[in-house]
Amino acid sequence: MAALLLLLPLLLLLPLLLKLDVWPQLRWLPADLAFTVRALRCKRALRARALAAAAADPESSESGCSLAWRLAYLAREQPTHTFLIHGAQRFSYAEAERESNRIARAFLRARGWTGGRRGSGRGSTEEGARVAPPAGDAAARGTTAPPLAPGATVALLLPAGPDFLWIWFGLAKAGLRTAFVPTALRRGPLLHCLRSCGASALVLATEFLESLEPDLPALRAMGLHLWATGPETNVAGISNLLSEAADQVDEPVPGYLSAPQNIMDTCLYIFTSGTTGLPKAARISHLKVLQCQGFYHLCGVHQEDVIYLALPLYHMSGSLLGIVGCLGIGATVVLKPKFSASQFWDDCQKHRVTVFQYIGELCRYLVNQPPSKAECDHKVRLAVGSGLRPDTWERFLRRFGPLQILETYGMTEGNVATFNYTGRQGAVGRASWLYKHIFPFSLIRYDVMTGEPIRNAQGHCMTTSPGEPGLLVAPVSQQSPFLGYAGAPELAKDKLLKDVFWSGDVFFNTGDLLVCDEQGFLHFHDRTGDTIRWKGENVATTEVAEVLETLDFLQEVNIYGVTVPGHEGRAGMAALALRPPQALNLVQLYSHVSENLPPYARPRFLRLQESLATTETFKQQKVRMANEGFDPSVLSDPLYVLDQDIGAYLPLTPARYSALLSGDLRI
């Protein structure tokens, strides 16, 4: 009915709209309308769930925080339905509920809770009967850490697996915040993360104990409760969490223990990737966790689907979108601890996978694999994710289709998300007025030289025209908040823009440049810090990379800017990885960039590597590569320089490097 009410006035206005030449956008109206209706239904369903939990008995397991009541509900409604597949292990929703209940009770014991009834009204911090934890607990751990307070933060340093999920869910049920720590961090970065989120405890995988040994004195000095997850835990001051949980009953935990005072309260911390510095602990609210229950619903995924997830759980894409999104629809998730391109299609065939959650690099790894029989006999109908480049998109569909690719855009700490629900290749979303009515955002003009939005005489920002790159911003509101980061308030200063369209308004600054085309499709253009300026022109590193990646002998390309003495701006440099068994063809490469890129956008330097440096989530390391420069006496990789006079890429020898610095070699 809602769809008909929206469609009727548009039909009446159709003749006028055709005269105004808006048909390029109107042709996508059915898809826009269908997604809008789905989004409205999703919002209504999430609101109904939240209201039902709020009205439930505080003693019931179906009250409290959204993770607690959603899992309890699914355990009651579909107890035998498979929730998790991990290797040869299978866990039903009822088993997930019981395992997390044991973990919750182990943590509640560390809080001093003994299972009494609650004392007063909803939202109170009273917990019923609470006493100090048994005296032997702290002594056994060799720590003087006080009992965990309600709302204390417990950091997880765990690989993707069942233990990660049961501990995360158990912490939520126990009324404790969780901090997901990237598993590769050690020494200074690890201690920084623990301090920045105010962690009171750390749960670590036993397999990490050896590499963490140098950090243990500092961890003990911080007064942390220390737990490990395995029978091999025999290090002084570290207890075996799973052993403690095994001693607990698996009965449901009262919901009031996890009920937030406010839905905007911090539920957990997720650390940014740290590509430009130390990671920041993004605050994730209870509202955002609830909203993430709707992710797969918005993507058209259903309860009977089987979702393949091989992304790190310490990032939002794996935990909130993958796991919480799966809980939102009650589906099954196949959790792979580490992505393997050679095993992917065999896994999909074995587990009858229908949905695959990706980041762009995973799809590129798949298309670069040798053909296999399993890739022709699968049931995958939908791939959902972000960061898929157009050339890989086309190759992926041509080789593995028919299936749908649903590209999305979003940020861990952000308040805006986009969905390309039409399948248009290369687009990250739609900017239809229907979509922006539900998920408001704008593209504003941006000066890459000053690093600031362009403002008019009144001091307000201006929206971009079709085809013009613009900074993506979204209004901060009660429905779309920005909570910032744990620690000093100035960490979030650059993420907020004020007086954008009117005095007093506040918008979230994504730091990303997007382009909206004539048909209303959004295309990722560049990160504001990644756009380089050379010869007085702006160069989008992503566009240059996409051009080079069409060469059949290149498997991976990373474009970044380097400072050249005697020149303004930053010159483009391309780190290249070859596609085996191909060889680097400098003549073809120069011809290709000359034909497809303007002179100022052509890379001045090439660096040939066996594989390109990435973060744990496969994001390319641009800052590090830029800092390493192009000095052949420092770098062992083969280097090449563009000689403008000759019109060719030549080996960057020490002699040519000296000629470049003296100005004798023109680039």
Swiss-Prot record:
It is found in: Mitochondrion membrane. Residues 114-144 are annotated as: Disordered. Its main location: mitochondrion. Mainly functions as an acyl-CoA ligase catalyzing the ATP-dependent formation of fatty acyl-CoA using LCFA and very-long-chain fatty acids (VLCFA) as substrates. Can mediate the levels of long-chain fatty acids (LCFA) in the cell by facilitating their transport across membranes. One of its GO terms (molecular function) is long-chain fatty acid-CoA ligase activity. Belongs to the ATP-dependent AMP-binding enzyme family. CDD domains: hsFATP2a_ACSVL_like. The keyword Amino-acid biosynthesis does not apply. It catalyses: a fatty acid(in) = a fatty acid(out); a long-chain fatty acid + ATP + CoA = a long-chain fatty acyl-CoA + AMP + diphosphate; (5Z,8Z,11Z,14Z)-eicosatetraenoate + ATP + CoA = (5Z,8Z,11Z,14Z)-eicosatetraenoyl-CoA + AMP + diphosphate; hexadecanoate + ATP + CoA = hexadecanoyl-CoA + AMP + diphosphate. It is a single-pass membrane protein. Pfam families: AMP-binding (PF00501), AMP-binding_C (PF13193). Residues 130-144 have a biased composition (Low complexity). This is Long-chain fatty acid transport protein 3. ATP binds at T272, S273, G274, T275, T276, H315, T412, D512, R527, K619. One of its GO terms (cellular component) is mitochondrial matrix. It is an enzyme of class 6 (ligase). It comes from Mus musculus (Mouse). The chain crosses the membrane at residues 3-23. The lineage of its organism: Eukaryota, Metazoa, Chordata, Craniata, Vertebrata. Expressed at high levels in adrenal gland, testis and ovary. Expressed at lower levels in adult brain. Found in adrenal cortical cells, spermatocytes and interstitial cells of the testis, theca cells of the ovary, cerebral cortical neurons, and cerebellar Purkinje cells (at protein level). GO terms for biological process: acyl-CoA metabolic process; lipid transport; long-chain fatty acid metabolic process. Keywords: ATP-binding, Fatty acid metabolism, Ligase, Lipid metabolism, Lipid transport, Membrane, Mitochondrion, Nucleotide-binding, Transmembrane, Transmembrane helix, Transport. Its EC number is 6.2.1.15, 6.2.1.3, 6.2.1.-.
